[in-house]
């Protein structure tokens, strides 16, 4: 599989984390052989869970499911394996929780024995979103994320827009939420990066997170 497909898959998981509340952790470990292991632990926030349930209520009624799962572990595992990733592990013990781990070589991760650099490029997120099916894009449409739409908004304007449509509870929830990113070099050197959710949603340029 080509490198873009791997970028798309990571972009999908990163975009997903932007709506999962404060229970999101990502660990990237550089291996001596040049591969990287990525582990993600995601948990939907209560507010986002409520918004998803309300937004899909009509479809759920048609399918006869009151509370369908949000994550389908087998399908996610198959997609990651088909992209050429190794040691793929995916589990979802509850409808609001997802644990993912896999190993591979990625163009957006560069590292040596004592160094590691992760590049988040909004262009790869946009390209990925346009290639996805209607289900994922429907979720993205709900939140009108500037990283996807390309619209130039101030942080204040974006939060006010979300509050006007979905209520202040949701906008406040996103405003205080973070992605807890941990990088670990091949030598075991670690560094933590708390990334504000809103900063990711409004990503409009390449961001680098590094251990040197």
Show which residues each predicted segment covers.
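Bacterial N-terminal signal peptides that target proteins for export
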Residues: 1-9
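Post-signal-peptide N-terminal segment of Sec-exported extracytoplasmic proteins
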Residues: 43-75, 139-140
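Mature, soluble, non-transmembrane domains
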Residues: 77-212
């Amino acid at each position: 599989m080509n490198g873009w497909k791997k970028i798309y898959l990571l972009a999908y998981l990163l975009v997903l984390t932007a709506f999962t509340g404060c229970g999101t952790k990502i660990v990237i470990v550089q291996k001596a052989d040049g591969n990287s292991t990525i582990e993600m632990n995601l948990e939907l926030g209560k507010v986002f869970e409520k918004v998803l349930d309300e937004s899909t209520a009509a479809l759920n009624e048609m399918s006869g499911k009151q509370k369908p799962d949000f994550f389908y572990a087998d399908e996610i595992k198959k997609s990651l394996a088909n992209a050429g990733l190794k040691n793929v592990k995916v589990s979802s013990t509850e409808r609001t929780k997802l644990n993912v781990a896999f190993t591979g070589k990625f163009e957006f991760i560069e590292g040596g024995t004592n160094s590691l650099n992760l590049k988040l490029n909004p262009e790869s997120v946009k390209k990925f979103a346009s290639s996805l099916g209607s289900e994922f894009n429907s979720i993205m449409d709900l939140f009108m994320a500037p990283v996807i739409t390309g619209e130039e908004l101030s942080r204040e304007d974006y939060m006010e827009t979300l509050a006007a449509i979905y209520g202040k509870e949701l906008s406040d929830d996103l405003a205080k939420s973070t992605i807890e990113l941990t990088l670990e070099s091949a030598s075991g050197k670690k560094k933590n990066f708390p990334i504000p959710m809103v900063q990711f949603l409004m990503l409009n340029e390449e961001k680098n997170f590094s251990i040197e």
